[in-house]
Amino acid sequence: MSWCSSPDAVFHLAATGLLLQIAVPCLCSAAMNTHTRQPISHPTAEHLLAWYDRHHRELPWRTSPAMAAQGKRADPYHVWLSEVMLQQTTVQAVKPYFLKFLAAWPDVNDLAAAPVEDVMAAWAGLGYYARARNLKKCAEAVAREHGGVFPDTEEGLKELPGIGDYTAAAVAAIAFNRQAAVMDGNVERVISRLFVIDAPLPGSKPAMKAKVAALTPADRPGDFAQAMMDLGATICTPKRPACALCPFNGACLALARDEPERFPVKAAKKAKPVRLGAAFVAVNTSGEILLRRRIDSGLLGGMTEVPTTAWTARMDGGTDASHAPFVAGWQAAGVIVHVFTHFELRLTVYRAQVPDGLQTGPDDGWWEPVTNLDAQALPTVMKKVITQAIPSACRPENRN
């Protein structure tokens, strides 16, 4: 056993003025010695599945090995819903949304029949809202064209709206036990370290996927896919991987070089462009906020917002009160910053107190009580805007 003297691995116990230092075994890669590594020369599905059977994560959408042994099969609807939600989103963030969706729409036919406004409102806060629109379209296609039954092959799944290579492979493997190569960010990290793939992402993805395909077994391919994800999420983490606990540590080339954290290699990120705009929070005497619905296409399509200007890269464009949707006593309330995938948005926020019954035009939205904001499909950026203008608006005490 290797013992670590780093500050992170020393516990200090203070009792009646006595200070104790207790050394603990170190699980990080820097302390790995040859006698702590697994005696395997190359990674195999067998080693990983043995680890997974003991250490898998319990997740609400997952069929565990014990459940599978009792004859329970994965629900394709649950697998598909969770995989769409998990794209670029953490497990902890997804759990409550997954359970909320299941409570509202227990199967794909229920989701297909749901009003799109309800789906968007339920998705609000999870981000990447095109996923929600495609989720609804996909559910409708499954209900309409497949009788509520998901196709059971990668090719068939990819014909559905919003399902690409990754989601098709994940659903095919996990729900239908197809021998599909499933590769998310966690799997990329594991594979790049196992085989010391020096080419930077995203260009190295095809080489990585070929490695995954070669490792994926014909038996239990779904469990293998989930095991790879769990390994990356819990052991082969981006920082301070717990290499001593890894079932592949004896075959890991990055560990043999003592540099697992160098992988995966990523291309240098370009600075995100900045877009500017203004947002206008109008509050009437009854404590209602003027809201409107964005057009269905494009960024945040179909979501709810307060009136805003266009978001522009021009440094002289659309950030003052002269661009307000109507004349009122607009007062500057500050600036919020929100980072999207491809750009950074800076919105100057204005607030105005207006009388009840103000006519804003037939296409300018509706007045919503502050206490009912949780029921609206407000994306995170709009919650930031409203909170900037009305600090208490999105606090729990103001919710019904």
Residue ranges: model-predicted function:
Residues 42, 46-47, 51-244, 248-261, ...:
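Catalytic cores of DNA base-excision repair glycosylases
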Residues 13, 18-67, 230-400:
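Intrinsically disordered, low-complexity, charged terminal extensions of DNA damage-control enzymes
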